[in-house]
Swiss-Prot record:
Disulfide bonds: none
Keywords: Cell cycle, Cell division, Chromosome partition, Mitosis, Nucleus
Gene of this entry: SCC4
Protein's organism: Saccharomyces cerevisiae (strain ATCC 204508 / S288c)
Top-level division of the source organism's lineage: Eukaryota
Any one cellular-component term (Gene Ontology): chromatin
Name of the protein described by the UniProt record: MAU2 chromatid cohesion factor homolog
Signal peptide start-end: none
Amino acid sequence: MENLGDKLSISQVYHLAQEYRDHAYSIANKIGSEEGLKQYYGLMNMSIQMFQLLKTKCTLSVLEDSKVTFEMVELLIQETYNFDLAELYISSLKERLQTHQSDTDLVEEIMRCEFLLLHDLPLMRDSKFHYKIALRNCNELVQYMVNLQDELYQNWASVFQYVGVMLCIKLKQHRRVKTSFHGLLSQCREKSQWKWFLNLCYVNYLLNERFPIPEDALQELRSTELHTVGPELYAWKLALEMVIQLCKDGNITDHLNEFKNFFDTNKQSLVTNEGKGCVIKIMPRIALKVELPMIFHYKELKNILLLLQSVSYIVNCYDEKGNFSRKFLPKVYSTTQKLIKNIAAGGVSMNELDSRIQTYKSILEFCEFYKVWEQTLLKGAVVTTESPKLGPSPGYVRLLQAMKVQFEGGGAVEEYTRLAQSGGTSSEVKMISLLNCYTVQAARVSRCSGDKQGELVEQCNKVWLQVEKLLQETDLQFNPIWECTVTILWLFSHFEPFSWNPLPCSDKQRAEYVSKLREFYSSNKFVAGEAVADNRFKLKKALLLQILVNYLGGRMLEHDLGEIYAISAKCFDMCRQQGGMRKVQYVIGIWHLMNCTVAMRGKDVALTNAKLEALVKQITSVKQ
């Protein structure tokens, strides 16, 4: 490098720019006042000015210009949000690189410019307009590189096909995303880090959107090898498998043990590489550095696993032996608070620190929401909370508010309908909203007579079509709890004596739902000695559903009086295990009383009568 005047050399100015930046990073976690903010951004501006001085006052080689520009642009994008100026510098550098490409192999630098223009800048701008422009330019670049028929550019084309997929995800072009992922994966070498990385992205996308995951993607996920992808990506693989199992309401014990073994041998590597990014080798001359979310740092990952365990066991919160959610949720909350308190800069920007704090706050909000949900399961009513925010989006709070109105005797149909139609609402919140809305509407049909009945029936059918559509389009269809809930509600609303005015249906629908009930009943029958017909229909948790399945099965499928009596007795007794089920217990108690009477069990009749009278007193005293 040439000298910059008589005072400082170019290398000195360059190192000065780095010192200003690094010093700003070192004080980022200590900022607690406006003065501190001014100091931080003052240092960042000085760093940018030093880089600009190098570009405007010095004669830099192409590679030197690239190095300076890339470092300066990172600050412009991440610290000042001056995207237009960043784009100007990148475009100018790209033109210079293309002019000199005949003299030097500068493909990597040119591709980095393209990546910044087509990936980093559009994602930071985060607007549909910029995503569309970037996607069009990205497609043109890919086509250009493919037409060159050069192996090096063919490999770079796959990188920008990946960029195109990321842009399509942002534009919610879901059909195109799935097709593009399939095409990309089919082009990759088997058992390569690049292919397994793409598959991790694909499965992660499908889970995020709650789309069903194809078997070939699941098989690719299972085949991912630690020694090829490295500990960071393998931790991602394990986390995805855990979430998939949670979404299916499956047993997570094996996955927890796998994580334990993984931590035993890879803890140090995870800790050492925190914040350094993960380098994906595509070909010998091509690599892509990706930044994994903070939750894949060792301490954060262990905390997230505890949160996932809490969610997995939350429907068992009534069980004194298996109430892990009541033990783990407070622990996750306190651990997260400690992580916020002890957060350290570690050479990262203030924006990165803010991002980490927001992640921690999201975890705290999840904990708050699930604590309320847990109490709802235990008490059969939505409890009030002083927390200003529950869950990661307003939909969670609105759902609880609507449920509270419903529990207190109101309809809440309008709010449930709005929630189900909201664009940013999760699949679970939509499904709960639709099912609760259907329950309210079906209850109105049951009580209604006369002219309004036809209108209410039509409203019920419209809601049910949405329920079936959501179930078919998402991975909720693979969770037996959801399928069982849908089956039970349909049967309650279409058969006497559960409804005074059963909803009309076709013979095909009736046969389909009765067949599903038979499967769930065979797999979850309380009476000992019954073989499980199909593990897909086994309810591992969810006591209320188990009771209702046995209640419906006993009433609709059983014919032996002794069998019916045994089932009703067991259902009546099981209701006592979970709070908030007194009304369900009362209905089942009436059924059991009928069975005792028909079976001429005088002692049981008297005992059941006494229990029902005590139950009525408990229910009426709560109302008063």
